[in-house]
Amino acid sequence: QGVSSAASDVYKRQYIMIGMLVTGVAMVCGLMFYVVDRNVTQKDNFMEIGGERKTVQLPSCRVLKLTQPPVVWKQKKEGIVEAERMFSFGEVPLEVTAGDSLQQGSFSYAGDMEAFMSMTSVGDTLLVTFDFPEDKLEQHLQNDIWIRVRSEGMELRLPAEVQAVVVDVEDMEANFYGLRCDTLSFRTRYLARLEDCHVTALAAQAQSLHLNSGTVRNLYLNLDEIADWDVNTGSFHIDTEHLSGSRYHRCLLQKNECRRVFWTPLKDDASLSVELKQAVKIEVGE
């Protein structure tokens, strides 16, 4: 009986070990399937747009706006909206520079992008619209909600008359280089950088704003529209910062960032808390 009991215990332990081994193998296989499936999904939601680089001349305009339909709703049953589709341009940076020696404007991009864009003039505004209808999507993208557009960077050379640039495109970085003008305003959905820009009066609006090099005499910022902003005080110089907002805001003024700050509350309960690194003249408007 003792021998039989011992043998039974051995068999039980073997069964337990085999069960644990099978469970472990199943878990590893499941994890590998998840990782592979996740990587395939991440790769598959890229929309690659190539083609020979193309440059088109821009007509005269005062406002230049890049835009896209913000969402596309998929309706599979009458009255029922099941999903939305968005196109991210995080892989397509935009460079904004001055026009050529004749101060003419142009727009450069990958040639195949032309199938998904259009240019129209409305008054003094030039609209560049990016649109991706479902019948132009590859089969593997037609069930995706979030599609990432991947293409070479775009270059926008501004006509001399342009006073405002709007980049109303999801996740597109806008990099402003070498601009020299009296007045300019820009608005972007995402990130904006300024390099070697010299502007007398600049109104800037971006989710994330980085002033890296250049000069601005009067900088206008509505803090309601900016999540974060920074100034490289070693290479970017500001005379007066005109700050506004409709709620409570805080800001840090670095040493040598500016000479004066003018705060304009947009509501009665709006306020600005300022941390100073050196003496700065601060004025409050009504």
Regions found by a protein language model. Give the residues of each.
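Sequence-level detector for tyrosine residue identity
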Residues: 9-11, 15, 34, 40, ...
